[in-house]
């Protein structure tokens, strides 16, 4: 049973890489961000709190985040491993996590801020069904419309230049020290997150000592993309169940 943390600045592909690992190794993908977005979309009390924070481009407070993680892991089926993204984000959260849970490794997706801006500002969310898109990877068949339900594609509420600048600042100030804590315990493997998703996935597996992933058929044969640009059109987003 494998237990991993995946870390990286927003837009580095944490969700995509975590999902790929989860599918092949029976790991539950626990995404703190997806849990929050699900609550925002469904107008829960937690969602109202998070909406105000996200709109300001700030990070959610420790007590709120730790409560969500505790609740999610309390219901986790421990016959399966997990890969958690979006947590821990600062030293206090890291200390709480290490005191509470054993892990096998920390995957650090490394990416320069300039590439983060390029990726994040290309993200879109279906206003109808919640499917995630990234216009750098693959445009929808009809511009501005969801391939699944035909809903309007809109930027995420917190994907603005101003909000992103705040998140990048907070990331470097608060998250880098977390990596130092994990490095001292020799948990961290660092992978360049700039190449295509399949290249990044294979690099992660090499560094973790996991079997390689079977590569998909080339685009011409499979009728789709092979190792394209980061992010994906038609990836499940906040319209699904949180953290699944």
Language model feature labels by segment:
Residues 1-2, 100-105, 183-188:
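Short glycine-/polar-rich loops that comprise or flank the Walker A/P-loop
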Residues 6:
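Hydrophobic anchor at the beta1->P-loop junction of P-loop NTPases
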Residues 9:
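P-loop (Walker A) phosphate-binding loop of NTP-binding proteins
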Residues 14:
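Conserved lysine of the Walker
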Residues 28-102, 114-115, 121, 125, ...:
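ATP-dependent small-molecule kinase phosphotransfer cores
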Residues 118-165:
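Cys/His-rich short segments
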Residues 152-244:
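NTP-dependent small-molecule kinase module
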């Amino acid at each position: 049973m494998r237990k991993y943390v995946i870390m990286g600045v927003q837009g580095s592909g944490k969700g995509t890489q975590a999902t790929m690992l989860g599918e092949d190794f029976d790991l539950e993908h626990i995404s703190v961000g997806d849990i929050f977005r699900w609550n925002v979309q469904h107008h829960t009390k937690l969602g109202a709190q998070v909406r105000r924070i996200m709109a300001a481009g700030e990070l959610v407070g420790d007590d709120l985040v730790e409560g969500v993680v505790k609740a999610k892991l309390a219901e986790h089926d421990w016959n399966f491993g997990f890969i958690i993204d979006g947590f821990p984000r600062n030293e206090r959260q890291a200390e709480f996590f290490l005191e509470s849970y054993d892990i096998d490794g920390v995957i650090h997706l490394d990416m320069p801020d300039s590439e983060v801006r390029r990726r994040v500002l290309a993200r879109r969310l279906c206003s109808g069904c919640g499917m995630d898109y990234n216009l750098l990877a693959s445009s929808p068949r009809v511009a501005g419309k969801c391939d699944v339900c035909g809903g309007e594609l809109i930027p995420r509420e917190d994907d603005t230049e101003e909000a992103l600048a705040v998140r990048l600042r907070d990331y470097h100030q608060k998250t880098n020290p977390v990596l130092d804590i994990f490095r001292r315990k020799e948990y961290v493997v660092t992978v360049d997150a700039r190449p295509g998703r399949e290249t990044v996935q294979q690099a992660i597996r090499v560094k973790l000592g996991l079997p390689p992933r079977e590569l998909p058929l080339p685009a011409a044969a499979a009728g789709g993309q092979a190792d394209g640009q980061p992010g994906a059109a038609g990836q499940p987003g906040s319209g699904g169940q949180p953290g699944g």
